[in-house]
């Protein structure tokens, strides 16, 4: 459990200058899930809603400096790991995880395969990511990445994917989230498969939209935040799945980019702000400027601070 009211969540991942994926999506997701987000950059990615243009990987020494800057100053409640780029970066992150307390939950989103099916990592780096799986609490591969991890064919339905995940969860001694969003089905259920073979499924319906850029980053970051807040795997996945479904529902309204746009990470707070303007309460901007114009309450204020509160409330104390 976090010591403060907000779990402090570190994202270790690449970037997205258009804000839909990578650390930019991570920070918004962490905030939406009730956490305080921090990030360490593994790779600078020139991408937008239409695709990736180029990737620049800073020296691993700079990655080390970023990690040291965080851990020297901030107590971490949860970690989310995204794009690792190469074997050297993966090894450095693995070393960093060994320095964390055992009760800090770590979520790995193994970015290994592009939506097109292209492999993003060299064979050595893929093996390093496989090894890293045994150091984390839970992994969130898409179906293509699950197939790469297990050296199997890509699953054609959720039940087949769950069976494959059971194999990897047992072998790597880590929980595996199976994501049904890429399946050709009216449902988009997720499931968490534990090393003991138990499965907890979370129902979700498919949303008819092309704007799903960064959904993997967003789900894993929200999941890490809820785990950092003390939720169980099942409770964290349930919250994150339902939140992400709503974010996808509201994605089209953002109108960001010409390709596959981002989801609306802050849809809940946006709706609250819009609703606030319709509440039946007085307009209070002038209350503090001219308190003498506000009716005095029937009971005299006990002091200046109480008087100030009554003035701000516009005398609506009943």
Residue ranges: model-predicted function:
Residues 33-38, 198-200, 226-241:
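Phosphate-handling active-site elements
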Residues 24, 29, 147-148, 210-233:
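Short, small-residue alpha-helix embedded
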Residues 6, 54-57, 235-317:
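Charged C-terminal helix
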Residues 2-11, 23, 31-115, 262-272:
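Conserved N-terminal subdomain of the carbohydrate kinase-like
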Residues 12-18, 199-213:
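Short pre-catalytic strand/loop immediately N-terminal to key active-site residues, enriched for Gly-Thr
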Residues 122-199, 208:
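Conserved phosphate/ATP/ADP-binding segment of small-molecule kinases
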Residues 19-35, 297-303, 307-312:
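N-terminal basic/disordered segments at the start of proteins
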């Amino acid at each position: 459990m976090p010591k403060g009211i907000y779990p402090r969540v570190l994202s270790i991942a690449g970037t997205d200058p258009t804000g839909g994926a990578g650390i930019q999506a991570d920070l918004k997701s962490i905030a939406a899930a009730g956490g305080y987000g921090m990030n360490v950059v593994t790779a600078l990615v020139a991408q937008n809603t239409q695709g990736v243009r180029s990737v620049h990987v800073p020296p691993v020494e700079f990655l080390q400096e970023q990690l040291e800057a965080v851990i020297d100053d901030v107590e971490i409640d949860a970690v989310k790991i995204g794009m690792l780029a190469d074997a050297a970066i993966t090894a450095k992150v693995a070393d960093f995880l060994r320095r964390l307390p055992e009760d800090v939950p770590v979520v790995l989103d193994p970015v290994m395969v592009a939506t097109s099916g292209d492999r993003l990592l060299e064979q050595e780096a893929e093996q390093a990511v496989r090894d890293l799986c045994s150091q984390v609490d839970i992994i969130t591969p898409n179906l293509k990445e699950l197939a790469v991890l297990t050296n199997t064919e890509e699953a054609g339905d959720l039940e087949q994917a769950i069976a494959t995940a059971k194999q990897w969860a047992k072998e790597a001694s880590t929980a595996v989230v199976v994501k049904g969003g890429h399946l050709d089905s009216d449902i988009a259920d997720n499931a968490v498969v534990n090393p003991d073979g138990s499965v907890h499924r979370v129902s979700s319906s498919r949303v008819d939209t092309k704007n799903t850029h960064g959904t993997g980053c967003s789900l894993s970051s929200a999941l890490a935040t809820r785990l950092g807040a003390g939720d169980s795997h099942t409770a964290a996945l349930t919250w994150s799945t339902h939140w992400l479904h709503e974010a996808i529902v509201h994605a089209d309204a953002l109108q960001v980019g010409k390709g596959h746009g981002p989801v609306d990470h802050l849809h809940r707070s946006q709706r609250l702000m819009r609703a606030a303007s319709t509440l039946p309460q007085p307009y209070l901007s002038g209350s503090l400027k001219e308190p003498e114009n506000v009716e005095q309450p029937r009971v005299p204020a006990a002091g200046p601070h109480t008087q100030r509160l009554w003035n701000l409330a516009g005398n609506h104390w009943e």
